[in-house]
Amino acid sequence: MSEHINGKTVLITGANRGIGKSLVETFVAHAAGKVYAAVRSLDSAAPLVAEHGEVVVPVAIDLGDPASISAAAAAAPDVDIVINNAGVLETSAPLDDNAVASLEYELKINLYGLCHMARAFAPVLAGNGGGAFVQLNSVVSMKAFAAFSTYCASKAAAYSMTQSLRDVLREQGTHVVSVHPGPIATDMGDSAGLTDIAEPASLVGDAIIAGLASGAFHVWPDSMARQLGGAYQSFAENVVEADMSEA
């Protein structure tokens, strides 16, 4: 159990599978008082409720539907920690016939969905003392791979937005966290052909718990992420995490 999680109310998008499901398990294990399992179909959260009981409360969120996000924020006024985990991945190289369509779809969910989540839940977090907003980005936010280039572009955009959210939300006392997993053992990882090098999803939750405790902005959950993070850290500390003043 972590004292900084004990009794807190957490909302996790994409909670019914993959990293999201693992995050629910992690926060329940760390004695969160309530975990809103945000899913597109409420029925998909039934196994989580069956396993964990009334601590898990299903709520409907589709990151492609801003109205559902606003409704969820109204239905969950007690949230202390928002974890925006849900996302989509298309395997599109830059010149593929489906590249533009893939990019439009991925931006709608991975970037615009982030913006809608932040706009809807920032007032909720402010009303509950600031709390934390955790965004699941990726190592591909910083290093692109041609086979799923449009996904990389959408996550790079989401990382840029997360940096801006950090600056804006600190004014209301909200701790913003940018999480950058490498290959993780999920359906999404399998679809990207990363099964052989994937690491357990539980690493992500453990790293987020540690990042919330330490006040970190960047979180590197797995071995590939830590390797990239080590190379990136000097730049991050001097540019990304620095308060830049006008010359």
Model regions: which residues?
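Conserved glycine-rich cofactor-binding loop
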Residues: 16-17
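Active-site helix of classical SDR
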Residues: 118, 154
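Conserved mid-core segment of classical short-chain dehydrogenase/reductases
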Residues: 89-104, 147-150
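Residue(s) in the substrate-gating loop at a strand-loop-helix junction
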Residues: 138
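The beta1-alpha1 cofactor-binding region of Rossmann-like NAD(H)/NADP(H)-dependent oxidoreductases
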Residues: 60-71, 100
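Conserved glycine-rich Rossmann-like NAD(P)H-binding loop of the short-chain dehydrogenase/reductase
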Residues: 28-47
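SDR active-site lid
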Residues: 160, 164-223
